[in-house]
């Protein structure tokens, strides 16, 4: 087992030792996702390619670790329990995942058109298929929860500040849109990896794995992939904001070397692949965002993820 995680700029192939999904690309879909998450209306292709590489690398590493957990408990497939186990230390992101699983169950009820008779029949038969994701999560967390804090998340109505900020940003984006732009924006917001399930599975090269993820585990992986994109956009927007020198700011000269190169070096501008005045997120924004995030939860941080290996930390979980 290779214990060295990929660096932010590594390719998925080099990090995993497998040429996974290299003929399949989500770059086009990612451009739409990035737009809906706060990027410019026409996100840069080269930025989307870099984001795709980061997401792919992280998911391959996550799959490898989930497979190891599954193997330790003698299972033949990767299940939601394996992913929940890996996420158990990060309460905020685990809470977000549990809410997602609740919403998936709720949507399933609507799609299947469950009526009162169906619900009564399920109750009488002892079946709980209508809430299968919630039940999986609740049963598993109950089995490992020593303090009650994990189960308390099911009753937690705390506002998710990250989600709130994303919604407010989306609202600000739509203020200046005409009807055609708004329709395009709404369409972009509907995109997800879960709606491209077959392509997503091929992208991760699941068919070549000895221990494969089951259907619900794939749903969670698709969710985590989207959350990784969202967090990359969140962080890159902060980096871009910091790169704008503020008039009258006495500390504007004390920016990092990365920013100095961005402003003053033609080589740095060329490395971004676009003109510096573009309002789109650029590759250098993504790289700086990853550098900051990895440093923030580095080896000396008390909040280091339990499943983080020596290298880039997982963004979504």
Swiss-Prot record:
Record carries keyword Ubl conjugation: yes
Subcellular location(s) per record: Nucleus
CDD domains on file: HFD_TAF13 (cd07978)
InterPro entries in the record: Histone-fold (IPR009072), TFIID_TAF13 (IPR003195)
Cysteines engaged in disulfide bonds, as pairs: none
Chain intervals for the UniProt region annotation (Disordered): 1-20
Keywords, comma-separated and alphabetical: Acetylation, Activator, Isopeptide bond, Nucleus, Transcription, Transcription regulation, Ubl conjugation
GO annotation, cellular component aspect: nucleoplasm; nucleus; SAGA complex; transcription factor TFTC complex
Positions carrying N-acetylmethionine: 1
Keyword set includes NAD: no
Tissue localization of expression: Expressed in all tissues tested including pancreas, kidney, skeletal muscle, liver, lung, placenta, brain and heart.
Single GO MF annotation: protein heterodimerization activity
Chief site of localization: nucleus
GO BP terms: positive regulation of DNA-templated transcription; regulation of DNA repair; regulation of DNA-templated transcription; regulation of RNA splicing; regulation of transcription by RNA polymerase II; transcription by RNA polymerase II
One Pfam family this sequence matches: TFIID-18kDa
Cross-link (Glycyl lysine isopeptide (Lys-Gly) (interchain with G-Cter in SUMO2)): 112, 123, 163
Family membership: Belongs to the SPT3 family.
Subunit structure: Component of the PCAF complex, at least composed of TADA2L/ADA2, SUPT3H, TADA3L/ADA3, TAF5L/PAF65-beta, TAF6L/PAF65-alpha, TAF10/TAFII30, TAF12/TAFII20, TAF9/TAFII31 and TRRAP. Associates with TAFII31 and GCN5L2. Component of the TFTC-HAT complex, at least composed of TAF5L, TAF6L, TADA3L, SUPT3H/SPT3, TAF2/TAFII150, TAF4/TAFII135, TAF5/TAFII100, GCN5L2/GCN5, TAF10 and TRRAP. Component of the STAGA transcription coactivator-HAT complex, at least composed of SUPT3H, GCN5L2, TAF5L, TAF6L, SUPT7L, TADA3L, TAD1L, TAF10, TAF12, TRRAP and TAF9.
Described function: Probable transcriptional activator.
Name by which UniProt lists this protein: Transcription initiation protein SPT3 homolog
UniProt source species: Homo sapiens (Human)
